[in-house]
Structures are given as structure tokens and as C-alpha cells.
Amino acid sequence: MRECISIHVGQAGVQIGNACWELYCLEHGIQPDGQMPSDKTIGGGDDSFNTFFSETGAGKHVPRAVFVDLEPTVIDEVRTGTYRQLFHPEQLITGKEDAANNYARGHYTIGKEIIDLVLDRIRKLADQCTGLQGFLVFHSFGGGTGSGFTSLLMERLSVDYGKKSKLEFSIYPAPQVSTAVVEPYNSILTTHTTLEHSDCAFMVDNEAIYDICRRNLDIERPTYTNLNRLISQIVSSITASLRFDGALNVDLTEFQTNLVPYPRIHFPLATYAPVISAEKAYHEQLTVAEITNACFEPANQMVKCDPRHGKYMACCLLYRGDVVPKDVNAAIATIKTKRTIQFVDWCPTGFKVGINYQPPTVVPGGDLAKVQRAVCMLSNTTAIAEAWARLDHKFDLMYAKRAFVHWYVGEGMEEGEFSEAREDMAALEKDYEEVGADSAEGDDEGEEY
């Protein structure tokens, strides 16, 4: 088996976790108490969904997941919510006081009190796996727990499970809306610390998702539930190939192999289509060609940046539902002729395709329409550097005046860590610039890696 353990850190991670597990349960026909009426073989480990669920002797399916937060309120909602019976109480780990939007508290002072407990629980989950494939870590960049504790956890996971892949789903601070003033600090500190420990990080920017909800789903004032349900659809598309059998199945390690040309350049851009409300879907065809084209619209991306200004290094199209390879090939051929999509010259237009016959499931009473087919595109493009540049600029404005730095130093950090992290980010921006540059200029660029 190729099991995956999901780790949900901090408020954002936990709430996205709720949306994801709700959707997984619907997709696999698992009831909120973990029973699965359709599954007659108790203890049979041959079904694909067992990558995400373990099965007890009593036939109860338990998510291979850990929820961690340094303060209890958010996870208490899981403990009392609809899915309270789904999780083992030991999988829901809470501290007493929160990280107060402070990376240093999450990483040093408060985080270190709880890290061993968390690793112990993860170890128990890992011991139940026959062939652990890797970890999916969900967190935000802006929060104290999401940034500080996640980076601590990633460092420790690298030590304990050296070769296992670690994929992140990170909530990137939105360009316009902000939930905390110190988001740029936390984001840059966590990116710097996690850069060498993460194999692949899918970033999601709340503002981009807000816009999609407003524009495509006609929700005037999207709530976090709306956002998280949309994010969970994307996560579900990415993980569908691990949980269902399909024609062209994609494995966790396959993502990395196909999307990450250099170890540091591991931030693919996710795009999902069709995001459409039930009223509209009723009148539309949504052919393979249409949804494939929609993936190349900046409006459907999960991070605000413009790939038309950047170059693509790799592209992965994950289809699910009623899709045949013939249609996919035709759609891709059309896109290649358009020439609006520029690939770097050292990577001929490679599209990796995954097809899964399980149609997309929607949460009843949710906003998304039930459709026959959907596609999630993961593309590694140099345009994502725009997102880093934006964040770095905000960091610089605050750090020039050393604003808020004393909160971090007071928790045992040193100012040097800030400048070190910022230099690393500058190097990352430079890496993106060099990858996008034409290789004809000089062949001596390969020495860095």
C-alpha cells in the first residue's frame, strides 16, 4: 500500500482539513461515524481508499490524519462537530495557549512543548502503514502556529522519515486582505526554514479564491467555509489518483518527478475548472476542451500571478470523471498551437496527464455544481515568483523600521534569522529568474544545483 498521512496545523490547516475529510467521506461513501456500508470486506487492505483511511477490526474507517493547534478552540469544533466520531481522540492534539501570530512562539517557545507528542502520534499512524508514501501538510503561512510549528515539524519529519516525501498545501497571505500585520514576517521565516525540507508546496492565496467564489459562484460575501470547500475540491483532485483506481494514475512521487526541475523550485501553481454554480452548469456543456482551456485562464488560479508573463517549466493535468485520452490529446494540441503559453526553452512542451474515472463529488448544500468532469492543473511556472516578490517587498517595508521585531526576539529568536531568511528569499527569486532565462546565454549556470 502507498499510504499518506495528512497533518493539519493551525486554524487554517484544521479548517481545510475539515472540508477535505468531509469531501473524502462523501467520495468514498464513508459515514460520519466511520462506517462504510458499501464496503463488505472488513479488514481488506486492497482498496485504494485505504491509502487515506485505516480500518479497525470493527469495520470502522479512521482517517490517517493528525490535527494540531496550539490553542484548543478550533479543534474543539472538530471534537463536537458532525465528524467527531470519525477521528481517534488522540489524533486531535491541542495546546493551552496559542502562538499569537508569532512564528517564534510556534517554532520555539510553545511549539517545542508539544512537538514530541505530535511526532509520537505520527509515529503511531506510520506504524499502521505497510508502505508509507509520505506526508501532506496543510497550514497557512501567516499564522503563528501555521508558520512556526509547521517549520519545526517539517525539520523533525526530515530527521525521522528522511526519504519520505513531504507535500505542503500552504495558504499564502492574500495581496490585499490581511488577517495579521506580521504575515510577511511569518511567511518568509517559514518558507526559509521549510524550503529544504519540503518536496513540493501547493500554494493557495485566499484572495484568489475569494475572487473565484464571487465571480464564478456569485457568492457576494464568501465565508471561509466557501473558500475551504473550494480548496478541498482541489486537494481532492490532486489526491484522487491516490484514492481511486484510474486509467492514468498519478502517484505522490510522480508529482515531484514531473513538476520539480530543481529542488528549490517546488512551488507549482494550481488551477481548477470548472468552478461553476448549479444555475449556470445547467446551461453549459463543459467539454474537455473547455475545461482544459479554463485552466490556462489566470482568473481560475489559486494564486494571484500572471503566467502569461512567465514561462512554464512543467505542466500536469489531472482529469476526473467522464474523460477519454483522445479528447485530452486534442485539447492539449489546441493549446500548444495557441502559443500564448510559453515554455522555457530547455523543457519541450511536456504535459503530464492523469485520468481518473471517479467523477467529482460535491458537498450537498454546497456552492459548486455537480459536474460530469473536472480538471486540476498543476503547473510549475516562473510567474509564481511574482508572489514571492510581493511578500518580500512587504517584509522589507516593515523590517527596514524593525517594526514588530521585538516580539520575535522576546521569544528567543535572533535578528540574524530575519536577514538570513530574507537573503534566502532573494536567492529564491533569483533562482526563478535564472530558470526562466534563455539557456543560450551561457552554459555555466548549472553549477548551483
From Swiss-Prot:
Some glutamate residues at the C-terminus are polyglycylated, resulting in polyglycine chains on the gamma-carboxyl group. Glycylation is mainly limited to tubulin incorporated into axonemes (cilia and flagella) whereas glutamylation is prevalent in neuronal cells, centrioles, axonemes, and the mitotic spindle. Both modifications can coexist on the same protein on adjacent residues, and lowering polyglycylation levels increases polyglutamylation, and reciprocally. Cilia and flagella glycylation is required for their stability and maintenance. Flagella glycylation controls sperm motility. The record marks Y449 as: Involved in polymerization. The active site is at E254. A motif (MREC motif) lies at residues 1-4. The modification Phosphotyrosine is found at Y432. GO terms for biological process: microtubule-based process. Tubulin is the major constituent of microtubules, a cylinder consisting of laterally associated linear protofilaments composed of alpha- and beta-tubulin heterodimers. Microtubules grow by the addition of GTP-tubulin dimers to the microtubule end, where a stabilizing cap forms. Below the cap, tubulin dimers are in GDP-bound state, owing to GTPase activity of alpha-tubulin. Belongs to the tubulin family. Dimer of alpha and beta chains. A typical microtubule is a hollow water-filled tube with an outer diameter of 25 nm and an inner diameter of 15 nM. Alpha-beta heterodimers associate head-to-tail to form protofilaments running lengthwise along the microtubule wall with the beta-tubulin subunit facing the microtubule plus end conferring a structural polarity. Microtubules usually have 13 protofilaments but different protofilament numbers can be found in some organisms and specialized cells. PANTHER family: TUBULIN. The MREC motif may be critical for tubulin autoregulation. This is Tubulin alpha-1C chain.
